[in-house]
């Protein structure tokens, strides 16, 4: 709540869109970050070993917390639990695709990726319906691999017709539909 936020975005309309920003910077993030790094490296105000030690201690304290913990329910199956089970069942070796929404956040946080290039999603581009076509592409590229599309009921409806493609090419990909009966992320931000 007391964070001082610097928001770098190439699109001025996005600055401060979701949270209050203390320092807005319009520009290409890669260019701006290079400039900031150069400015910091050129500064005489460099942290000393003691300050860095304290910082690393703080980081270790944060890492020791179970910040992704959640309470199990006897009433419903929690989406976090589903994604953790997916990781357990696949041994963490699946290619996982996702669209945009709360299911994307849960997949990113709870799958526990340990292999490179296994998390296929559109990032912050807001592309509902990305997950299933991406899973089809990954399955075609890696026919022997386990491919799972973690999606939500609104996202999967953007491209549900692609199930016929899965049938046509006999693709064994898995679809994990985390149905919360809402466009959850839209509702969350409203």
Positions of PLM-derived features:
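Generic enzyme active-site microenvironment
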Residues: 7, 97, 150-151
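Thiamine diphosphate
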Residues: 15-18, 24-26, 30-36, 106-190
């Amino acid at each position: 709540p007391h964070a001082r936020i610097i928001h770098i975005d190439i699109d001025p309309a996005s600055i401060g869109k979701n949270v209050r920003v203390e320092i807005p910077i319009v520009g290409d993030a890669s260019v701006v970050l290079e400039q900031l790094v150069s400015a910091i490296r050129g500064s005489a105000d460099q942290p000393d070993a003691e300050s860095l030690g304290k910082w690393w201690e703080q980081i270790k304290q944060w890492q020791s917390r179970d910040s992704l913990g959640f309470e199990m329910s006897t009433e419903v199956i929690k989406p976090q639990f589903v994604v953790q089970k997916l990781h357990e069942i696949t041994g963490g070796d699946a290619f996982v695709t996702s669209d945009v929404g709360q299911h994307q956040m849960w997949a990113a946080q709870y799958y526990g990726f340990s292999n490179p290039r296994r998390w296929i999603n559109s990032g912050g581009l807001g592309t509902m319906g990305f997950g299933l076509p991406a899973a089809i592409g990954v399955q075609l590229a890696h026919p022997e691999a386990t491919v799972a599309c973690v999606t939500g009921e609104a996202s999967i409806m953007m491209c549900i017709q692609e199930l016929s493609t899965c049938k046509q090419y006999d693709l064994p990909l898995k679809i994990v539909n985390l149905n919360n009966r809402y466009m959850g992320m839209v509702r969350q931000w409203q």
